[in-house]
Amino acid sequence: MEKYHVLEMIGEGSFGRVYKGRRKYSAQVVALKFIPKLGRSEKELRNLQREIEIMRGLRHPNIVHMLDSFETDKEVVVVTDYAEGELLQILEDDGKLPEDQVQAIAAQLVSALYYLHSHRILHRDMKPQNILLAKGGGIKLCDFGFARAMSTNTMVLTSIKGTPLYMSPELVEERPYDHTADLWSVGCILYELAVGTPPFYATSIFQLVSLILKDPVRWPSTISPCFKNFLQGLLTKDPRQRLSWPDLLYHPFIAGHVTIITETAGPDLGTPFTSRLPPELQVLKDKQAHRLSPKGNQSRILTQAYERMAEEAMQKKHQNTGPALEQEDKTSKVAPGTAPLPRLGATPQESSLLAGILASELKSSWAESGTGEAPSAPRENRTTPDCERAFPEERPEVLGQRSTDAVDLEDEEPDSDNEWQHLLETTEPVPIQLKAPLTLLCNPDFCQRIQSQLHEAGGQILKGILEGASHILPAFRVLSSLLSSCSDSVALYSFCREAGLPGLLLSLLRHSQESNSLQQQSWYGTFLQDLMAVIQAYFACTFNLERSQTSDSLQVFQEAANLFLDLLGKLLAQPDDSERTLRRDNLMCFTVLCEAMDGNSRAISKAFYSSLLTTKQVVLDGLLRGLTVPQLPVHTPPGAPQVSQPLREQSEDIPGAISSALAAICTAPVGLPDCWDGKEQVCWHLANQLTEDSSQLRPSLVSGLQHPILCLHLLKVLYSCCLVSERLCRLLGQEPLALESLFMLVQGKVKVVDWEESTEVTLYFLSLLVFRLQNLPCGMEKLGSDVATLFTHSHVASLVSAAACLLGQLGQQGVTFDLQPMEWMAAATHALSAPAEVRLTPPGSCGFYDGLLILLLQLLTEQGKASLIRDMSSSEMWTVLRHRFSMVLRLPKEASAQEGELSLSNPPSPEPDWTLISPQGMAALLSLAMATFAQEPQLCLSCLSQHGSILMSILKHLLCPSFLNQLRQAPHGSEFLPVVVLSVCQLLCFPFALDMDADLLIGVLADLRDSEVAAHLLQVCCYHLPLTQVELPISLLTRLALTDPTSLNQFVNTVAASPRTIISFLSVALLSDQPLLTSDLLSLLAHTARVLSPSHLSFIQELLAGSDESYQSLRSLLGHPENSVRAHTYRLLGHLLQHSMALRGALQSQSGLLSLLLLGLGDKDPVVRCSASFAVGNAAYQAGPLGPALAAAVPSMTQLLGDPQAGIRRNVASALGNLGLEGLGEELLQCQVPQRLLEMACGDPQPNVKEAALIALRSLQQEPGIRQVLVSLGASEKLALLSLGNQLLPHSSPRPASAKHCRKLIHLLRPAHSM
């Protein structure tokens, strides 16, 4: 303390006091935080030390800087920057801020969080009170009391920290969370700055948490679309879909304003939160989240039970229950050998969660009690009384007020209401009591009590005895709560089996439906409602899913489902005006059962839905009959034919439940394709009934499209049926009432409960009709402007994508709509950058973004002026598009860093999200890129050559065998796989087709080499493409191998890894009717033979010889009609003959093969003659037994010494020189070869030809006869003149290589040398 002057106190809280101070002997003003040690536990002191350690290493302009820290005897003192105030002061003084100021604060908050998250630090308590105002208008983030630096082995956390107003949904549900919880809090803060209140605020903690979990955010009209889109991304309830790093940095609301602090490399902290996790770490994170997540459906208890509990809780607030509880604790006993029930008391944060989770199911009851909308937040008391009770700071006595240590299951009266109430409270499905239900399940007395209560009270109920109902209802509620809250599926299923569930429940349901006397009882409705709640909770249990199966649970589940269908069928077969409540509850339970079936295996779900067309068809018939009776509340437009007008006074809950059940049967949930097999059969059945001329079903469903409640469900039913029936599409496309209803839905003229989803389904429905009919239904051409308006003006990404899908279909049918480039680019950018909420599978198994991508391609093609393409290529849309594609493919941020040495095992990559972009969408996106780069080729080069290029990472991934296997197995993947591969190859050809800087080209080649693209191209051709489409990939492979030695090795190693398959492919490709393909392959093989050692060339020998070693492939290639093919074949032979003794033997033993080789010497094409002379020359080198057979070639080669092509003359001269050593001197003399070679050596204009002739003469002079001829011709004198001419060249001119050989030959021809 001797370093500082303490000036004045500026703040106080439960942590201690904050003083303004000044460092002695300087003008530096600081803040001193005094934290008392007295009364602090060791854990609190450790947490304090952790905060200090975290703050000590932080250096960022938007994070408060800790200057110093020290301890006194009684306190810990932390010295930090002095700030001018809190952000909270602005809110209290001004209410809210202009959007430009909010934008500046947003950029600074994002900057601070980016810094923290890049260091793997979570703040976990983001709120206005922890944001300080610095000089100059900046902000600084402070208070790291809850911060947590995570180790590399920790991916998610479960401990709950933070302030309720700014807690994310996963926090209040106590699900595992990560850095995205901080981003949710930022969204809450920015919303509050702009609007004046937090996005979720209520006077009760119950209401608050309910709003956070369930309610959408209310958006005032004053917020700009860009800001709203930014907040929508941050305030997305699903953390997996929440706007996060790195996409957050590119959002237009803050792009370019975020400060990124780069630091020198420190210790390896693991993957920062600001980078996408590599696949292996993502798998680890998912496993941790799954292991730590609460299992099962929490909070699935009847609303009425919660309402009663809430009312009791409100009454108890005004009572002093301490003594009563204390007395109860004294009298309670625990039976020997039984596990005590868990304590109901909780820590302050646990209490808030308990209340919050209860509130998530109490939303409707609070609304009914007249609470209404959340009032504006009073600034003077932001936490509210309920929050204070939930988060007491200095009131430890509160913790034990609801504590009940144990419940004695033996000593209490069996029918005690208190006992069942305790059990109901104990089994409340809240996170802090996850162990309590498990304790009950492991208690044999509890299981026996439940079973006996159900048997005894059930028997009394069936006799109509009121006492039975009073005893069984509490047991029902405990069971419902227990089934909804327990996370241990093994223990829960074991308990159900021991307790006789669900058999007892379904038996009670069956007998109650058959008992007329029971149905007359006044309490019958309540009894059935609670019974159905338990059955519904049972069907929703996770042990009914195949991935969580326990012993024979799946068999029991299927049997229970079949029994329930029998009971439902009998109920639906009764008169429609009977048992309305029972009918409604059964239908709701059936809907839950369908949801459980959808998440199960293909076999189980198919058996279930198929039974609705066979043994359980009475259920489906009853549902369809319910839609055609007069109770259906259809809304018929004026002038339309009257169909089944409703009885207005009747309740609409039955038609709503029926339509919801039908939708559950027909609609395949996104991401669960296995259930479609069974649902498709049901849709076929319904479609056949809908297309019958005499059926009243179609008019009923069409009329219901304008009903507020039924509309969405019936849209889904009709849409699903049209997916399988083209005839139904034709009928609806010709039905005026159906089309009018759909048009009105698009135009917003029908009031429906969920306008966004209803409009989305309608847009896809109309797209499906156009797609299936391939023409426009009457009147749809007028819809273009309305759909275009939805596309450009909607801020809901799913609506923009659905509108784009329909616009693309309309455009293909010639409908024009006015879309300005800047408008559609902005709309596309918004849709691609906003979180995707996929609620329905688009037509044709398309992805969420497919329609948008197809529309963009269409617009670019139609409006494809160079200026437009330049605008698009430089727009934000282009960047967002690449990032979205990368996310769909689930690429890590640094894809290139994961590439290693050649690995043909190709470990599988994460499955792409086909629900977002399907194979068709990928093909459209790549075509869009091709259209852009064709006009702007330099853009392609810059995108591919920049370090860490997203485009390059995408293209490389699209060629990986693991991805191609996934693509082939995806719906319609086989159809679009060639398009994807060929588009990728075209894009990768750009660097080779354009004049590219050499250094940049080297970088591109290195990137492709490190990613094993050469190996992948060969595998693509062998396993995925038809022969007619391999020309381009082989051409690219050849170019890579000719340019880069490592790529050539990858090609050879890939052949060695699968020789039989690849040699078979190469054999077929060589003999194809595609000359360019054959030429490229021969060029690739020739380069391989020239560069690599003989040990790597056996596959080429096998390729040419064939399995029967007849060399039929080689014969066909030597006789090919195309000059280029013959030339490349001779060139390949020339390189092989340098190493292959087997090929030399084949030329000698295989009839006619040598003749084909020599035939090339007389070919009309000079390139072929050149290659043939090269091959014959190498055959003549150390020919051995082959030498005599080559004598027939001497006349032809002698004639070629006068060929106008210098290359041919050079090759022939070398070949003749080789033959002189094989005993063919007589033949050479007969053809006057020595004379011809001497003439070439002295007079050929090409230096390399002269050199070849001199080398040949040096070899031939060893033959006495040839030497004598040379001497007689005066070779020494002629060569001396040649040598003299070389010496007279200027000193600056380099001496030709032939000069050395000339001198050597003169020396050899001297008479003394001949001695």
Curated annotation (Swiss-Prot):
Its main location: cytoplasm. It comes from the Eukaryota. The active site is at D125. InterPro entries: ARM-like, ARM-type_fold, Kinase-like_dom_sf, Prot_kinase_dom, Protein_kinase_ATP_BS, Ser/Thr_kinase_AS. Keywords: ATP-binding, Cell projection, Cilium biogenesis/degradation, Cytoplasm, Cytoskeleton, Developmental protein, Kinase, Magnesium, Metal-binding, Nucleotide-binding, Nucleus, Serine/threonine-protein kinase, Transferase. GO terms for cellular component: cell projection; cytoplasm; cytoskeleton; nucleus. It is found in: Cytoplasm; Nucleus; Cytoplasm, Cytoskeleton, Cilium axoneme. Its EC number is 2.7.11.1. ATP binds at I10, G11, E12, G13, S14, F15, G16, R17, V18, K33. Transmembrane segments: none annotated. Residues 379-397 have a biased composition (Basic and acidic residues). GO terms for biological process: axoneme assembly; cilium assembly; positive regulation of smoothened signaling pathway; post-embryonic development; regulation of DNA-binding transcription factor activity; smoothened signaling pathway. One of its GO terms (molecular function) is protein serine/threonine kinase activity. Residues 312-345, 365-405 are annotated as: Disordered. Residues 4-254 form the Protein kinase domain. Interacts with SPAG16 and KIF27. Belongs to the protein kinase superfamily. Ser/Thr protein kinase family. This is Serine/threonine-protein kinase 36. It comes from Pongo abelii.
